[in-house]
């Protein structure tokens, strides 16, 4: 079970809304989001309703302003609680669409795909175990995308506008 609290103003001030499960539309509860407290669980936040737009991965902790979660604005319109996974993590990445081209298997965090696999683009992937966050740039920076178990035949399937990938991280709650 997870718990996240959204605040309209910075520094955990103003109107707030507490959430403990997936919510496809947060608009009825607050007009803007400038700070967040994650009491438990790992969450993916989305700038638009129905899990659309920029995504932001948050784990337990305090985020006193939207720059702390690498947000582009104070717009958070939907959220998803990421289920905890206690087993192994496994993903296969491919250099071309539809699982074609060279395949590499990943079982742990990857700070730089370029350094480790000599890749800066992934065109398809298959998440076999666990949930992952894909980052557009190395060192877990840039746009973020939640990858749940399943097949992603092209980068559009995970919500990206291009195949650029810099790093990958397993979703784990370390607290």
From Swiss-Prot:
Pfam families: Crystall. Residues 2-40, 41-83, 89-129, 130-172 form the Beta/gamma crystallin 'Greek key' domain. It comes from Canis lupus familiaris (Dog). Crystallins are the dominant structural components of the vertebrate eye lens. Has a two-domain beta-structure, folded into four very similar Greek key motifs. InterPro entries: Beta/Gamma-Crystallin (IPR050252), Beta/gamma_crystallin (IPR001064), G_crystallin-like (IPR011024). Keywords: Eye lens protein, Repeat. This is Gamma-crystallin B. Coiled coil: none annotated. Belongs to the beta/gamma-crystallin family. Residues 84-88 are annotated as: Connecting peptide. GO terms for molecular function: structural constituent of eye lens. Monomer.
């Amino acid at each position: 079970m997870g718990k996240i609290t959204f605040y309209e103003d910075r520094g955990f001030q103003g109107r707030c809304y507490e959430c403990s499960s997936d919510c496809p539309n947060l608009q009825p509860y607050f007009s803007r989001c400038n700070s967040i407290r994650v009491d438990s669980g790992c969450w993916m936040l989305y700038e638009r309703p129905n899990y659309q737009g920029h995504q932001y991965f948050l784990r337990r902790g305090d985020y006193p302003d939207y720059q702390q979660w690498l947000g582009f604005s104070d717009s958070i319109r939907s959220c998803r609680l990421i289920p905890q996974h206690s087993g192994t993590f496994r993903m296969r990445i491919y250099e071309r669409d539809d699982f074609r081209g060279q395949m590499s298997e990943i079982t742990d965090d990857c700070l730089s795909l370029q350094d480790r696999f000599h890749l800066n683009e992934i065109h398809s992937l298959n998440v076999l175990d666990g949930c992952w966050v894909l980052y557009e740039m190395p060192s877990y920076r840039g746009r973020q995308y939640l990858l749940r178990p399943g097949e992603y035949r092209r980068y559009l399937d995970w919500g990206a506008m291009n195949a650029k990938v810099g790093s990958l991280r397993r979703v784990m709650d370390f607290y």
